[in-house]
Amino acid sequence: MKTLLLTLVVVTIVCLDLGNSFSCYKTPHVKSEPCAPGQNLCYTKTWCDAFCFSRGRVIELGCAATCPPAEPKKDISCCSTDNCNPHPAHQSR
């Protein structure tokens, strides 16, 4: 019985620790950072602003509890694994 209880305690601690380790790439620094508890999605949001033709699309990366809602003229994608939202310019081709 004590072995079973000890096993359950160890499994609980491991699971709680893993729950806090979800990470996504975040802007403006485009580096992997831990997400807040409950935020288990990474998102990438891109759009054109007044300077789109000279510098390219604006890119926002971050964590979310739910995928951000659609917005006019903005592309939004979400994924649910660690660091699954790399900056498009940093992806291997």
Swiss-Prot record:
Presence of the UniProt keyword Flavoprotein in the record: no
Tissue-specific expression: Expressed by the venom gland.
Keyword Zinc applies: no
Record-linked PROSITE patterns: SNAKE_TOXIN
InterPro entries from the UniProt entry: Snake_3FTx, Snake_toxin-like_sf, Snake_toxin_con_site, Toxin_cobra-type
This protein's GO CC annotations: extracellular region
Gene Ontology MF term list: acetylcholine receptor inhibitor activity; ion channel regulator activity; toxin activity
Compartment annotation: Secreted
Signal peptide from the UniProt entry: 1-21
Chief localization: secreted
Key words of the record: Acetylcholine receptor inhibiting toxin, Disulfide bond, Ion channel impairing toxin, Neurotoxin, Postsynaptic neurotoxin, Secreted, Signal, Toxin
Disulfide bond entries: 24-42, 35-63, 48-52, 67-78, 79-84
Function as written in the Swiss-Prot or TrEMBL entry: Binds with high affinity to muscular (alpha-1/CHRNA1) and neuronal (alpha-7/CHRNA7) nicotinic acetylcholine receptor (nAChR) and inhibits acetylcholine from binding to the receptor, thereby impairing neuromuscular and neuronal transmission.
Family: Belongs to the three-finger toxin family. Long-chain subfamily. Type II alpha-neurotoxin sub-subfamily.
Full protein name: Long neurotoxin 1
